[in-house]
Amino acid sequence: MSEKAKKPQKLKARLPRGFVDRSAADIHATNEMVDKIRRVYELYGFDPIETPLFEYTDALGKFLPDSDRPNEGVFSLQDDDDQWMSLRYDLTAPLARHVAENFNEIQLPYRTYRAGYVFRNEKPGPGRFRQFMQFDADTVGAAGVQADAEMCMMMADTMEALGIARGDYVIRVNNRKVLDGVMEAIGLGGEDNAGRRLNVLRAIDKLDKFGPEGVKLLLGPGRKDESGDFTKGAGLGDEQIEKVLFFVGIKDYAASADDLAKLVAGTSKGEEGVDELNTIGALVSGAGYDATRIKIDPSVVRGLEYYTGPVYEAELTFDVTNEKGEKVVFGSVGGGGRYDGLVSRFMGQPVPATGFSIGVSRLMTALKNLGKLGQVKPLAPVLITVMDGDVESMGRYQRFTQALRAEGIRAEMYQGNWKKFGNQLKYADRLGSPIAIIQGGDERAEGVVQIKDLIEGKRLSGEIEDNASWREARVAQVSVPEAELVAKVREILEHQAEDVRRAAEGR
């Protein structure tokens, strides 16, 4: 008895963990937001560039290319010349490589913006993805803090261009140099204490997560979490901890500025950092940005390990409900700062740089919560239905379609099984088509087309119960000569747009 041939096993369709498919609505909303951001950047004189998704792993900075497989945090592969390449994890490291490689050709200051996907080889979770979009702007080759002040002003203008009202956002500014001065003042200056300074930076980076008491433990002996795991602390004494917490706990910079200046007095970096903060404050104030929009705030601690001078963060201050049903402040949607060391890694000479990055997906969530994004959906295409399948008729339907497109009207000729006309109208309904164009043999003989207003037809069918009222209402289907097709379609679309405007205004 012959063995039955085994059926080939179907390949299971599955999305990789930490990645998402994006719908048309999501893409349209992203494009709408990115276009608004781009317009602000270009008003400031920034121009676009684009770098590849892949870079040599050593160019990304954080990761060692000589490990067996450099996949800690990045997705990597080995090229045919045995060199490791990795998907970019941000847009800044590729910019640094680009600037260094083209340094003799580019014009400094080099002001650019970039939007694109970045990749993180990390454990995915709720709201934590392995691929997401960032939108960056950077100035390379400008050492003065006026470049940092301009970045803060551009961030503020970007928030407002996106429809976020004053009072619903704030750009918060700190300076890494001031913290360096604080650490020097408490006895952690010099190369011998580099490791302890790094531990302090990592401890205060947890301020939002653990609060002052949690950070106090991490600055001191250490902290045990709820699971019982123990994180060794930086080993500072009580007086040292008090001074660090004073600095990161400042809420009113103007009221605490004198005390901060005294704390870092005699430390070159600390005094320089305070001067830079004061200068940024004066520059933005002189340009008309008050402290409700751009605020000097030493509690900004994210990225202090990475940045070399001013650090800034765009925070949305309105409340949202989290997954636990609790009211929380929405929080950060972007940030940046001065990173004078990144380009210099390739150059052997100092190259100042400053910039910021917007988390596109997170900001898009905020804008949807505010009703500022995705409210105006792109108009679905006019559907040209197919009544007859002969070549002559098909050519005529295609001509109608092209005539509409030539006048800037989205149009689509039905490509499914044309013999079931009811399915064509169902398709138009699912698509959200505003109008259907119909021409059978009788209409073709007369040189006319039927234009069906699908939106008006749907409204009438829901509101009118008897045939008499239907006939007296605005006509939902009209017959016009072929030559008047485009003009009549445009007229109906304008009526529909006016109805939408009236509805939005409550009229």
From Swiss-Prot:
- Please provide, alphabetically and separated by semicolons, the GO molecular function terms listed in this UniProt record: ATP binding; histidine-tRNA ligase activity
Reaction(s) catalysed by this chain, per the record, are:
tRNA(His) + L-histidine + ATP = L-histidyl-tRNA(His) + AMP + diphosphate + H(+)
EC number of this enzyme? 6.1.1.21
Location in or out of the cell: Cytoplasm
Does the keyword section mention Protein biosynthesis?
yes
Recorded GO CC terms: cytoplasm
GO BP annotations listed: histidyl-tRNA aminoacylation
Name the keywords, alphabetized. Answer: Aminoacyl-tRNA synthetase, ATP-binding, Cytoplasm, Ligase, Nucleotide-binding, Protein biosynthesis
**Pfam assignment, any one:** tRNA-synt_His
Q: How does it assemble?
A: Homodimer.
Q: Which PANTHER family match?
A: HISTIDINE--TRNA LIGASE (PTHR11476:SF7), HISTIDYL-TRNA SYNTHETASE (PTHR11476)
What family does the Swiss-Prot or TrEMBL record give for this protein? Belongs to the class-II aminoacyl-tRNA synthetase family.
Official protein name in the record:
Histidine--tRNA ligase
User: From what organism does this protein derive?
Assistant: Agrobacterium fabrum (strain C58 / ATCC 33970) (Agrobacterium tumefaciens (strain C58))
